[in-house]
Amino acid sequence: MPHKVFLTRLKLSDFRNYATLALDLDQRHVVLTGENGAGKTNLMEGVSFLSPGRGLRRAAYADVARVGAPDGFSVFAAVDGMEGSVEIGTGTQGTEEGQSRRLRINGTAARTVDELTDHLRVLWLTPAMDGLFTGPSADRRRFLDRLVLSLDPEHGRRASEFDRAMRSRNRLLSEFRPDPAWLSAIEREMAGLGISMALARQEMLGLLSALVERSRSDGTFPSASLSLAGFLDDCAGIPAFELEERYLAMLAEGRARDAAAGRTLDGPHRSDLLIRHREKDIEAERCSTGEQKALLVGLVLAHARLVGDMTGHAPVLLLDEIAAHLDQGRRAALFDLVDGLGGQSFMTGTDRAMFDALGERAQYLAVANGRVSG
């Protein structure tokens, strides 16, 4: 069983509809119940800021700060983490657009938000993800990259640097006579970063697919088969340096085409995550809405188990409205699976009765108008 990582204290200041919030938590799961709009998801969004990135809503920081707040927002948590007890504080100063958030760990300023992954991994599933299988490929790439990031914290940096280099290449190609030496240098950088991204994604799919295959006998949720398409689909077994040279040649040969298009048409930013229902052997987008939800739940739980297996530390799970469309039997099975992961989870719902099967395994909190009571 992986080591249990859990929050013991959570404080929010000027965060969404919370002027101030202070919660003492124990090791159990946390169930948040209340009417829609009460602030349940806002609270979970606060927890999601204990991971790199912009949280489970991917919102601009200026939008996260409470309306009318004189300054930015802050999130504080005391965590029994991967390296022992730790105090984490993060937030922004001011309400202007384009600002970055600050991070302090045990009172010391962190060099980068990636340091959060030294202490805990936070994963989530929200209703906004329900359209993952039928939505644009960019959503599936983002989903996959978050899966990768949970095991490879450097993946986010590589993706950001690739995007920056690609924008530089696009600007150069828009010029009348771009400097060929500068263009070649940028393409060399893109090749190294792009292939690293592609291989990290392939490795994640291999690990996750193997775990899904081993867990198929559970049967509570359907299992998914996963593959990538759209960029170097036939790269299995080919050395990284050879793939880099291949991508470098693609970029050089595509300069005129990309200049005319105004964008780069080859690269990991064009990949798509393909998902199939294993038992029915059909594409996920052709499944019913209920089947798609069940597939997604199964995939997120499998990934959470993989993170626990690979790191030795169970992730913190944020499951928004997770029980809303499940019957009583499947809800009970879901709670057993979540509990079996060995970590702390936060779950939301409008009706506490939906969580009866959790019993004493959870701490129950009622949320109303930005206030939380036990």
From Swiss-Prot:
<keyword id="KW-0234">DNA repair</keyword>
<comment type="similarity">
    <text>Belongs to the RecF family.</text>
</comment>
<dbReference type="InterPro" id="IPR027417">
    <property type="entry name" value="P-loop_NTPase"/>
</dbReference>
<protein>
    <recommendedName>
        <fullName>DNA replication and repair protein RecF</fullName>
    </recommendedName>
</protein>
<keyword id="KW-0067">ATP-binding</keyword>
<keyword id="KW-0227">DNA damage</keyword>
<dbReference type="InterPro" id="IPR001238">
    <property type="entry name" value="DNA-binding_RecF"/>
</dbReference>
<comment type="function">
    <text>The RecF protein is involved in DNA metabolism; it is required for DNA replication and normal SOS inducibility. RecF binds preferentially to single-stranded, linear DNA. It also seems to bind ATP.</text>
</comment>
<dbReference type="GO" id="GO:0005524">
    <property type="term" value="F:ATP binding"/>
</dbReference>
<dbReference type="GO" id="GO:0016887">
    <property type="term" value="F:ATP hydrolysis activity"/>
</dbReference>
<keyword id="KW-0742">SOS response</keyword>
<dbReference type="InterPro" id="IPR018078">
    <property type="entry name" value="DNA-binding_RecF_CS"/>
</dbReference>
<dbReference type="GO" id="GO:0006302">
    <property type="term" value="P:double-strand break repair"/>
</dbReference>
<dbReference type="GO" id="GO:0000731">
    <property type="term" value="P:DNA synthesis involved in DNA repair"/>
</dbReference>
<dbReference type="GO" id="GO:0006260">
    <property type="term" value="P:DNA replication"/>
</dbReference>
<keyword id="KW-0235">DNA replication</keyword>
<dbReference type="GO" id="GO:0009432">
    <property type="term" value="P:SOS response"/>
</dbReference>
<dbReference type="InterPro" id="IPR003395">
    <property type="entry name" value="RecF/RecN/SMC_N"/>
</dbReference>
<dbReference type="Pfam" id="PF02463">
    <property type="entry name" value="SMC_N"/>
</dbReference>
<keyword id="KW-0238">DNA-binding</keyword>
<keyword id="KW-0963">Cytoplasm</keyword>
<keyword id="KW-0547">Nucleotide-binding</keyword>
<dbReference type="InterPro" id="IPR042174">
    <property type="entry name" value="RecF_2"/>
</dbReference>
<dbReference type="GO" id="GO:0005737">
    <property type="term" value="C:cytoplasm"/>
</dbReference>
<dbReference type="GO" id="GO:0003697">
    <property type="term" value="F:single-stranded DNA binding"/>
</dbReference>
<feature type="binding site">
    <location>
        <begin position="34"/>
        <end position="41"/>
    </location>
    <ligand>
        <name>ATP</name>
    </ligand>
</feature>
<dbReference type="InterPro" id="IPR003593">
    <property type="entry name" value="AAA+_ATPase"/>
</dbReference>
